[in-house]
Curated annotation (Swiss-Prot):
Keyword Ribosomal protein: yes
The gene coding this protein: rpsI
A single GO BP: translation
Biological classification of the source: Bacteria, Pseudomonadati, Pseudomonadota, Alphaproteobacteria, Hyphomicrobiales
Protein keywords: Ribonucleoprotein, Ribosomal protein
Biased composition (Polar residues): 1-21
Protein name: Small ribosomal subunit protein uS9
Superkingdom as given in the UniProt entry: Bacteria
Location of region: Disordered: 1-25
GO CC annotation: cytosolic small ribosomal subunit
Amino acid sequence: MATLQSLADLNRANTQTSNPENEAPVHVQKLDAQGRAYATGKRKDAVARVWIKPGNGTVVVNGRPVETYFARPVLRMILRQPLEIVSRVDQYDITVTVKGGGLSGQAGAVRHGLSKALTYYEPELRSSLKREGFLTRDPRVVERKKYGRKKARRSFQFSKR
């Protein structure tokens, strides 16, 4: 084996042995037959299936308009966050089916699914959505109740005497 004489030799040796598999993957657009991007999002016990396509900004959740399904403005704000971050409000028609959990968990699941669908439709948005944390699955779920306790951590009342 030949010994390397300088840093330049070392750099040349490193560039010759680099493999194209180690380079960052190129993200491509993923669309179905109707030209829609599809993704699933999860939060707590809720699972949302999200389809997006270019349009005028209509959002349908389980066959109902978003204003009637998510009546609280806070939940609609959670839903719109990914679109506002990437400046794509009113540019996509969004269809969602969501089940499980409560309304807050469902709104978080829709946000997660919508963020993933946006990256499938426009791969260049991935870095800005990832920076905001919208592509990361929130792992927090309800802690189970333990036997010998009133709740997950709360003990029964203790009487010393």
